[in-house]
């Protein structure tokens, strides 16, 4: 029987999405953010190094500006995200401070990771922050980037951004928090007999199709970008866990080896009992 082994994991990238941070009412999920800060601070106290990739700038901005709908105009999207990013970081800073943990902000655009000099600079920034015991909080710089907005030239969403960050920081593990339990063989919202994939060692065409590619049973939902992110992690010889973010404390259970979510790890590195 395959067993998850995370005892040697030191550097962890955690990605949390807007759906985990913003309630269906559009209000901010303060309880969830507090739980996340507690978990990350607990991991830091145990000697782990944690980087947080956080979406939510648009959601925070809509809440602050009392806008019911996301604007369709690109410039307004950028303005709303700019307002929301400040509010989000302010809240993160306040809540993490309750657990004596300092945070910093790193905003990325595609050109930063494309050009060697800027990539080296941001890599050094990550290393310096981590060496100081600070949690870098990463997001795309929506105020100047059109990649994540409703625009044709997409860098990718924060799922892929988290995989990029895991790669450039040489993280031991990427934990992706979602509003689903993991990767299923088909859509659990449509098929009652859908089965959760506990482990994925190879990203096959079947998996890509079931996640949102051609002939998908999933349709929309963002699963394809998560599978693509896992593929990027594989290319960097890393591993990833896709799990439900409803209870951030489950991160601690995952690191204890409990079989929550879907574990993406290439087969040649899998350890057996």
Swiss-Prot record:
Pathway noted in the entry: Amino-acid biosynthesis; L-proline biosynthesis; L-glutamate 5-semialdehyde from L-glutamate: step 1/2
Binding, ATP: 15, 178-179, 220-226
Keyword Transferase included in the entry's annotation: yes
Pfam families per the UniProt record, alphabetical: AA_kinase
Chief site of localization: cytoplasm
Catalyzed chemical reaction(s): L-glutamate + ATP = L-glutamyl 5-phosphate + ADP
Presence of keyword ATP-binding: yes
Keywords: Amino-acid biosynthesis, ATP-binding, Cytoplasm, Kinase, Nucleotide-binding, Proline biosynthesis, Transferase
Domain of life, source organism: Bacteria
EC number: 2.7.2.11
Binding site for substrate: 55, 142, 158
Single annotated GO MF: ATP binding
GO CC aspect terms: cytosol
Any one GO BP annotation for this protein: L-proline biosynthetic process
Stored CDD domains: AAK_G5K_ProB
InterPro entries xref list: AceGlu_kinase-like_sf, Asp/Glu/Uridylate_kinase, G5K_ProB, Glu/AcGlu_kinase, Glu_5kinase, Glu_5kinase/COase_Synthase, Glutamate_5-kinase_CS
Main EC class the enzyme belongs to: transferase
Function of the molecule: Catalyzes the transfer of a phosphate group to glutamate to form L-glutamate 5-phosphate.
PANTHER family recorded: GLUTAMATE 5-KINASE, ISOPENTENYL PHOSPHATE KINASE
Family (UniProt): Belongs to the glutamate 5-kinase family.
Official protein name in the record: Glutamate 5-kinase
Source species: Streptococcus pyogenes serotype M2 (strain MGAS10270)
Recorded name of the encoding gene: proB
């Amino acid at each position: 029987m395959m067993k998850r082994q995370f005892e040697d994991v030191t550097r962890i990238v955690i990605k949390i999405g807007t759906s985990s941070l913003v309630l269906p009412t559009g209000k901010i999920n303060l309880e969830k953010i507090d739980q996340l800060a507690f978990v990350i601070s607990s991991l830091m106290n145990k000697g782990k190094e944690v980087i947080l990739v956080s979406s939510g700038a648009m959601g925070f901005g809509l809440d602050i500006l009392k806008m019911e709908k996301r604007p369709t105009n690109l410039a307004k999207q950028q303005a709303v995200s700019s307002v929301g990013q400040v509010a989000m970081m302010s809240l993160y800073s306040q809540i993490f401070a309750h657990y004596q943990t300092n945070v910093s902000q790193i905003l990325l655009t595609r050109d930063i990771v494309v050009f060697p000099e800027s990539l080296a600079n941001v890599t050094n920034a990550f290393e310096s922050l981590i060496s100081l015991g600070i949690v870098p909080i990463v997001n795309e710089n929506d105020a100047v980037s059109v990649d994540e907005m409703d625009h044709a030239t997409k860098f990718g969403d924060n799922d892929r951004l988290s995989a990029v960050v895991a790669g450039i920081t040489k993280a031991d593990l990427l934990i992706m928090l979602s509003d689903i339990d993991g990767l299923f063989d088909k859509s659990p919202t449509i098929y009652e007999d859908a089965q959760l994939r506990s482990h994925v060692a190879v990203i096959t065409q079947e998996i890509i199709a079931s996640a949102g590619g051609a002939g998908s049973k999933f349709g929309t939902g963002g699963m394809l970008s998560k599978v693509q992110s896992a593929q990027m992690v594989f290319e960097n010889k890393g591993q990833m866990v896709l799990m439900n973010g409803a209870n951030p404390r489950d991160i601690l259970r995952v690191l204890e080896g409990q079989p929550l979510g879907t574990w993406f790890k290439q087969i040649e590195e899998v350890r057996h009992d």
